[in-house]
Amino acid sequence: VEGSENEKAIDITSLRGSTGYITLDPGYGNTGSCNSSITFIDGEKGILRYRGYPIEDLVKQGVSFTDVSYLLLYGELEESQKKTDFKEYIRTHANIHEDMNRYFNGFTLSAHPMANLSSMVTALSGFNPDGDSQDPDVIDENIAKLIAKVKTIAAYSYRKSHGMPFIYPDHNLNYVENFLYMMFGEPQKDYIQNDVVSDALNTLLVLHADHEQNCSTSTVRMAGSSHANLFATISAGIAALWGPKHGGANQAVIEMLEGIYKDGGDYKKYIDLAKDKQSEFRLMGFGHRVYKNYDPRAAVIKDKAKQVLDSLKIDDPLLDIARNLEEIALKDEYFVSRKLYPNVDFYSGIIYRAMGIPTNMFTVMFALGRLPGWLAHWREMVLDGQRINRPRHIFTGNTKRSL
């Protein structure tokens, strides 16, 4: 079979039935689990497109996160009554049930914000008993409901972990502004929006909105294939994202940069350590499972990082260290020959840090951005009528034994 971008695959749907063989592909690096029209990636050329639109163009034109969400879900950017209704629903349904607000009291201050997020998204299923409906209209409403409410849950997860009172959503604000207001607003005080910060956060959310069949998206498809409740299915995706090999990479970058700074800022020393086979040090934020070229998202974020720091008048030495590491690595044969280029995580943590978002919230921010991608893939799977996912394994245990 051949995709619309000339990607070639071997259809093995009937392999076991006709030959008795199955394929073995640990990690699924050579396996296409489905057909999809949502996101195209060419890792060799550094291409990422949502529904045909290059990610760089979406950012350059300032397309909003809610518009990109609609694009991923329904395939179009053009204005329509359906799109207007979608955005209005998201704007006016950001509040969560008051009983859910009280659920937060069950979490300790030390609870990880991802624990709060995952649990509270699952709890939404208790307030939405039609979460397992296959009716297209109900599906679309539940999708908009999740996009509207997860940002509120994310902001409340942050405030809970800091012992701060919740700030209720303001329906007069756009998606990103409302999130920042709920995160950093104070009771009885006006919250002053910073347009550069809002724009940078919108960019980060857009860049993270989808990335084809990654671990968490595949988890959503896997759980959703059983027709599990949508809210619980998204919670499964959040759990998969929580893993440090998936959603925690930008936190690891910040911790690495902080370590280099505390050690005197000698970035050349750490370049040498990264190349030393005897060293356990790994240069975080370089290389990607898919991209064998410069991650197109990283190029965009690099510029946004400087804009945010300049706007907030922050002189962050970590940005200088990051730039120096990148400059050397892009010219060093060791990294070039191994196709180790900066990825999206290399600069995103610096932006979050400048905004005042703590490192334990970085993965929550990733989840907030990835939500429309999860929902788009779930919707596509349900409407395509894909059967329940059921991989097999090659048994390598004991043969039959006697008691």
What residue ranges belong to the model's regions?
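Non-transmembrane, aqueous-exposed alpha-helical and coiled segments at domain scale
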Residues: V1-L403
